[in-house]
Design a protein with these regions (language model features):
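Membrane-interfacial segments
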Residues: 38-41, 45, 84-92, 125, ...
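Alpha-helical transmembrane segments and their helix-entry boundary regions
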Residues: 58, 130-132
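Terminal transmembrane helical anchor/hairpin motif
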Residues: 2-12, 132, 137-207
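Helix-loop-helix units of permease transmembrane domains in multi-pass membrane transporters
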Residues: 34-68
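Secretory targeting signals
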Residues: 1-29, 33, 60-125, 143, ...
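Transmembrane alpha-helical segments in integral membrane proteins
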Residues: 25-41, 115-129, 194-207
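Tryptophan-centric aromatic hotspots in well-structured domains and transmembrane helices
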Residues: 45-46, 120, 158-160
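Short amphipathic alpha-helix initiation/capping segments at coil-to-helix junctions
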Residues: 110, 127-130, 154
Length: 207
C-alpha cells in the first residue's frame, strides 16, 4: 500500500540515487571538464595566460573550480532528497548522520574521480569532444554493469556509485509487489581505491 511504501521510502530513494547518478554524472562531469578547459582552448588563450602564470597554477585553478561545482552539485542533491521526503511525507526517518555522510561522500568521491579523468583527456587532447564521447560511453558501461554480477562493477569506474552504495534489495514479493531493503556495511576499500584513483588522475594531468 501507499502507507507501506512511505515507511521504506528513503531506502528506495537511496537505492535509486546511485543508479540515477550513474546515468547522469559521467556525462555531466565530461561537460563540466570540457567547458572549464574549452574556455581557454578557444583562441589559444593558454599561450597568453602562460606568460602571466605557470601551467600548474592554471590547472590548479580549473581543478579547484571544478571541485567547488561538484561539491555544490552533491549538496543540492542532498538537499533535494530531504525536500522530496518532506513533500512526499515520508514516514521513514532520514538516514543517520554517519550513513548520510558516507553516501554523499561516496557520491562526491566518484564525481571527482570521473571529473579528473575527463579533465585529463581535455588537457592532453586540447579538444572537448573526446571527453564528451568517453562520458557517454561511461554512462552506458556504468548502467550496463548495474545489471551484471556484482564483481563486474568493480571494473567500471563510471559506475562506482552502485557498488559503493549500502542500500540493497533484500527481498521482492512478486505477488504483493513489496520490496524489502537492507543496509550492508560501508565499502571502505572501494572508497579508498576511488580516492586514490582520483588522486592519480589529478597528478597525471598536473604533470
Amino acid at each position: 500500500t501507499g502507507a507501506d511504501e512511505l515507511t521504506a521510502a528513503y531506502s528506495a530513494l537511496f537505492y535509486s540515487l546511485p543508479i540515477i547518478n550513474t546515468i547522469l554524472m559521467p556525462l555531466a562531469m565530461a561537460i563540466l571538464a570540457s567547458r572549464l578547459w574549452d574556455v581557454e582552448v578557444k583562441g589559444c588563450t593558454p599561450k597568453l595566460l602562460y606568460t602571466l602564470q605557470s601551467r600548474r597554477s592554471l590547472f590548479a585553478a580549473k581543478a579547484a573550480l571544478g571541485l567547488a561545482e561538484i561539491f555544490l552539485i552533491v549538496m543540492l542533491e542532498a538537499a533535494g532528497s530531504l525536500l522530496i521526503g518532506h513533500l512526499q511525507h515520508y514516514t521513514q526517518p532520514y538516514p543517520a548522520a554517519g550513513q548520510a555522510a558516507y553516501l554523499w561522500g561516496c557520491t562526491f568521491a566518484v564525481d571527482c574521480m570521473i571529473f579528473f579523468s575527463e579533465l585529463l583527456l581535455t588537457v592532453l587532447l586540447a579538444n572537448p569532444l573526446p571527453a564528451l564521447c568517453v562520458g557517454i560511453l561511461g554512462t552506458l558501461l556504468g548502467l550496463f554493469s548495474a545489471f551484471m554480477p556484482a564483481w563486474v562493477g568493480y571494473f567500471v569506474p563510471w559506475g562506482y556509485f552502485i557498488p559503493l552504495n549500502t542500500y540493497r534489495i533484500a527481498d521482492w514479493d512478486q505477488a504483493s509487489k513489496v520490496v524489502t531493503y537492507m543496509i550492508v556495511p560501508f565499502q571502505w576499500p572501494l572508497l579508498v581505491a576511488t580516492v586514490v584513483l582520483a588522486g592519480i588522475l589529478f597528478f597525471a594531468a598536473w604533470y
